[in-house]
Amino acid sequence: MAFLGGYEKKHKVTIVGSGNWGSTIAKIVAENTRANKDVFEEDVQMWVFEEDVTIAKDSKHYDESIGDAPQKLTHVINKYHENVKYLPGITLPSNIIANPSLVDAVQDSSILIFNLPHQFIRNVCNQIRGKILPFARGISCIKGVNVSDDGVSLFSEWIGDGLSIYVGALSGANIASEIAAEKWSETTIAYDPPPMDNSRAPTPRSQSPGLTMTVTEPPADMQHRDARGRKSKTKLTPVPAEYPPLDHACFHSLFHRPYFHVEMVSDVAGVSLGGALKNIVALAAGFVDGRGWGDNAKAAVMRIGLMEMVKFGKEFFGETVHTATFTESSAGVADLITSCSGGRNFRCARKAVEKGITVDEVEKQDLNGQKLQGTSTAFEVNSFLTARGLEKDYPLLTAVNAILLGKASVDDIPSLVSDTERKQPLP
């Protein structure tokens, strides 16, 4: 996709993180920077947390002269163009530059793509604060939200507030191994261009995803607003006119591939919430599937869960959250379907019921010390709702928490969620 206008500078892109999903995103982005050299610098920096790796004997990169001697992961990626530890068997574009220095990797980059475990966000931001371009913009590929008794916060805003930049979010029914193998899938990118950027090349905005949109003028005060529509405390620096506009068209060209279709929306909160709440619903789907109730029961759980996801978003983020983000986008219903069909939360919940043990016991047996995202999110969301006296308004989310704590059984689910039939229809 060619951008007209003859801009003096191109956007440099850095991927912050190099795990399974981070390397997959780097592959996509590097393919597109190479295809859109009028907009982006071709080389893509990828920050790699340096570690020693040993190349397996059955790998095509195995060197008998080195044998089992450990090698630096960055060296291996740059030499063989493969992340042999986190994305083995997938050839990465040669314009990906693995960099062990976080500060050096982000230097002079106008687009930062974050893809790392959420518990490392604050440390990473502390390391690069004041060392990035002040007008840089970001995309968070970190699924989920942070929920505490105090409130719900978005990881994209953790990053944005920490670095004084604007950050959107990417989420969807995206299994990294399938995308890396170039099996077709969709994703949703939520990016609500700050008014000072949007005034250059306004991005159409609408109440729902899709191509038919209505342009709205940016606020006269050019004040950036957060995901709840409030004036943000973060003061942003406009993207200089020497660069192509960082709008929906630009990010679409950076992420869209023939095998990875991108839908652009403005609802950052909705996209982020979808990636978190679907894990709780997936546990419920696993419970009823493990009980042997079949596809009808699983479909009922998904329908009720989807309604509660929309309600949660509307109740705690207001009109910035759009129903269509949940009902029409990959970040909503598609990710929910994938998670309730074979995701890790679904599988562990199903096994717990089939074996007559707790989900916690399945975690200990099968996950090598890791924890399910669904269980922690279920506890956090329930605590948040209970602190506000709202747990009865979300019967499915509340039922999952009760089952996890042993206060209810799977057999109770139909009666626990029956009052959803009396609730108001989706707006």
Swiss-Prot record:
Span of the signal peptide: none
Any one Gene Ontology BP term: glycerol-3-phosphate catabolic process
Top enzyme category: oxidoreductase
Binding site for NAD(+): 17-22, 49, 120, 176, 344, 373
Any Pfam family matching the protein: NAD_Gly3P_dh_N
Comp. bias regions, Polar residues: 200-215
Active site (record annotation): 278 (proton acceptor)
Binding residues annotated for substrate, in chain numbering: 143, 344-345
UniProt-recorded Gene Ontology molecular function terms: glycerol-3-phosphate dehydrogenase (NAD+) activity; NAD binding
GO-annotated cellular components: cytosol; nucleus
Reactions that this protein is recorded to catalyse: sn-glycerol 3-phosphate + NAD(+) = dihydroxyacetone phosphate + NADH + H(+)
Region (Disordered): 192-238
Keyword NAD: yes
EC number(s) given by UniProt: 1.1.1.8
Keywords assigned by UniProt, alphabetized: NAD, Oxidoreductase
Entry's family note: Belongs to the NAD-dependent glycerol-3-phosphate dehydrogenase family.
Name recorded for this polypeptide: Glycerol-3-phosphate dehydrogenase [NAD(+)]
Organism ancestry: Eukaryota, Fungi, Dikarya, Ascomycota, Pezizomycotina
